[in-house]
Amino acid sequence: MNNTNLHFKNEIKKIMNYFNAGKYSIVIQKSKILLKKNSEFIPLYNIIGISLQRQKKYDEAKNIFSKGLLVDSLSLDLRLNLANTYKAVNDFVTAEKNYKKILEINPNHVLSLLNYGNLKNDLNLVDDSLSLYDRALKIDNNNFTIHFNKAFLLQSIGNFVEAIFHAKKSLEINENFTPADTLLSKMLNYKENKWHIESMVQKLKKKNLTIHNLYNLHFALGNVYEKIGNTSLSIKHIIQANEIKRKSLKHDIEDEIQLFKKIKDAFKSLNFNSLQLNEDQNHKNIIFILGMPRSGTTLVE
């Protein structure tokens, strides 16, 4: 391996480390530099696009995935990411076209079947969604995500027997996938299923749970203890779940700061003393009303 290829490979490793750390702006910046050196390296388009997705910059994500498809129109990963981006902005028609395009190329593309099934679920097309999940499971019956999504859908339509089966199957495949525990905690009768409580208590002792799985486990235990009448333990686990989830939330307020700065700058240029009312309204005062969503409060000046 020559020095150029070695440098490129090392830079990719660094970028992936930044990606895994959630430093998406750095990922985008460094990936674009590499892309200028090798515009045909398709994984870079995916890395940049997914980072933009995580930042909710969906238009930019669509653009980068589309540019990648101009380089390789048969890249299923690129087209899947493009479809998921359209789905994220509720452009279900374009998302569906891209899912169908992938499945025309490869009818057994499991991730496309899964995500297409999720889209149908979003549209409340239950039978279509279940059909796509079943197609995916015939190809990969050991995919815990498909089992969980199917369980979640079945639970929503009241088919608890099958929902419990698939939630349990999800945990058999990946016992640390605690959203399945949370789902089970809403359906099981704990007079008959004390095994699940013990399983979750033991799981809580593990050191390798992700933050996401840890707070889901606390939520599940909170549900269970509420069901069996142990209010103090229920409250304890719900509080812990909320504390963990709150710490895990990473929200960049820079966009909001810039928006408010622009609003303030715009208002600085206004001379309110020069504002004129219509002649028949001279007896009225100007009022400003500020509504604060979800606060239950409105300020009137």
Which positions does each model-derived feature cover?
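Alpha-helical solenoid repeat scaffolds of the TPR/TPR-like class and their adjacent stem/linker regions
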Residues: 1-301
